[in-house]
Amino acid sequence: MFYPQVDQDDSLILHTDLYEINMMYTYFKKGISERNSVFEVFFRKEPFGNGYAVNAGLSHVIQYLNNLRFNESDLEYLKETCDYDDDFIDYLRNLELKLTIRSAREGELVFANEPIMQVEGPLAQAQLVETAILNIINFQTLIATKAARIKVAVGNDGLMEFGSRRAQETDAAIWGTRAAYIGGFDATSNVRAGKLFDIPVAGTHAHSLVEAFNNEYAAFKAYAEIHKDCVFLVDTYDTLRSGVPTAIKVAKEMGDKINFQGVRIDSGDMAYISKKVRKQLDDAGFPDAKIYASNDLDEKTIQNLKMQGAKIDVWGIGTKLITAFDQPALGGVYKLVAIEDKEGKMRDTLKISSNAEKVSTPGKKQVWRIQANSEKKNEGDWVSRYDEDPRKFDALFMFHPQYTYINKVVTDYTARPLLQEIFHEGKLVYEEPTLKETKEFAANNLDGLWDEYKRSLNPQDYPVDLSQKLYDNKMSLINDIRSRIVKRGY
């Protein structure tokens, strides 16, 4: 059977759902494909029952948009597969990116029901990019958030990403690794991700090394003779009676010839075993040797182990991080919020639902992070019409968008806009920070969040409030649409 090679220079322009191109075709045939439009990306609920999400994926979106073009192979496929006329195929052939993209930067903490990315430009183009943008942002934000939860659980302990072999294919492995680094991980075992993104790489060895040499002493000695930095996996046979004593023996024999960094345990009762291992290492004169742990760990297991006094210094996390094991999808959506009418004026749009949480908020927006100057902690986010600026106010009235009686007045605050311009009419205008800077930015943002919002279980809801103008506009549009439906009788 023949399996086609994936072209590494593929622009990914066909990485979209068919209905996106069908809608493009409809817009084209009806003469509205070039009308200005505004779409926004947001999610309705933070993942994992968390109090926040860590934005990730923007760099990948930039890469995707920079290469957005149809090649002749793409066009031939569409012509053969779909009932599109030649004029539309020519339109696709001549497509040039004209979109303006605004986004929260990577590492920004983002919350439910606020735009994290805004796409403005020709309707057909803005429709085309929906699938890929959601695919990228949903996955990478999910992994970065899971990583941040784990980072909060381990505190100052070391964190290593071990998930490549359990990831859903190669791209998920490398982009998931990058997202995990943003979320707080220190290193990865994935060499390709290390090369591509300049992430520190680290690793120990597998049980197969021990089995290949028949016994732990021969295996550890062989490894130590080849590698300066040594972490020995000690649970192949018997951790306490064989593995750790053998690691200690080899470390003493090799002396200054190696850097004995510690031992790794991958099975058993890690709370009990790690305490025993710590005593063995200390008694042997290796108080600085670290204990590494792996074996289907996540933030819940780590919290329990710490409550039991586990003596673990470095945590290797794989399956439950890279697959977002307890919630494998974020659920981000992409909604039209404004469109140019036939008179050339922008008209706000919204989706109405019988579920209050699914009623979208119309209009082009900005998100402002409001921080109290006295505490240097976030008061909440204020979502406004794009032309509003809370920095001009002496006091800011903030209220819950559904339960308006929940409100407060904030004074002496700093307001920071989250949506930055990334592309301007198709041209990249954003200078990406380094990945290390992005990781530090995420950590600093977490420091600005009250602990009540960072709880892994039942966190306090973070305030995401609407400006009065935005709220009034939403209510006005809802009432207008309902009155028109009543007049029509359906």
Where are these regions (language model features)?
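Glycine-rich phosphate/ribose-binding loops and adjacent secondary-structure elements
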Residues: 208-378
